[in-house]
């Protein structure tokens, strides 16, 4: 969003320079066209450029279309502020190194299963993690931690790990 604000400030300066009484109408029209193009590109970046990359992952014998949380901002947001997740969809976090990353349900609107992964093997599953009651202060949110150091996490719809028979010891892999 900061880059979008910079674009808007730049556009304000640009418009203030082109809206002068001594500018010919042709240049003013050209300036307006450039302004419109820049605004459209800025909006396109804001709404399309921030989409998460989609990959296919395999957990046991099950394939999911997983959104990849790559940046720190994407990892912090996760599935927050969404109303649902398709049954065959997931959110994938790759931390690059082992650690005890904690997860919370801030802004979540639906329950999930959190699958803890270490070296491409499931080492734990936090099942049916509930969405918090709206208005719950951040300080009151429960933190969920893996049973041991992990390097990856997969979030899926609540109950799906039981329904699909996903269990500790199953293998995880990226299909594409």
Language-model-derived ranges and their functions:
Residues 27-37:
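Hydrophobic H-region at the start of alpha-helical membrane spans
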Residues 1-28:
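N-terminal Lys/Arg-rich, disordered targeting/topogenic segments
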Residues 2, 29, 40-176:
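Compact, glycine-rich, soluble single-domain proteins
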């Amino acid at each position: 969003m900061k880059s979008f604000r910079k674009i808007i400030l730049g556009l304000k300066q640009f418009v203030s320079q082109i809206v002068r009484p001594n500018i010919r109408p042709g240049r003013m029209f050209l300036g307006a066209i450039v302004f419109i193009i820049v605004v459209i590109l800025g909006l396109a970046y804001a709404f399309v450029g921030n989409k998460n990359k989609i990959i296919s992952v395999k957990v046991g014998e099950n394939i999911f279309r997983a959104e990849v949380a790559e940046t720190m901002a994407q990892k912090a947001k996760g599935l927050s502020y969404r109303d649902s997740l398709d049954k065959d969809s997931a959110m994938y976090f790759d931390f690059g190194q082992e650690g005890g990353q904690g997860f919370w349900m801030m802004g979540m609107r639906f329950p999930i299963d959190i699958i803890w992964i270490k070296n491409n093997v499931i080492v734990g599953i936090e099942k049916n993690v509930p969405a918090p009651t709206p208005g719950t202060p951040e300080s009151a949110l429960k933190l969920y931690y893996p049973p041991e150091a992990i390097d990856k996490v997969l979030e899926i719809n609540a109950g799906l790990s039981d329904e699909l028979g996903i269990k500790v010891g199953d293998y995880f892999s990226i299909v594409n």
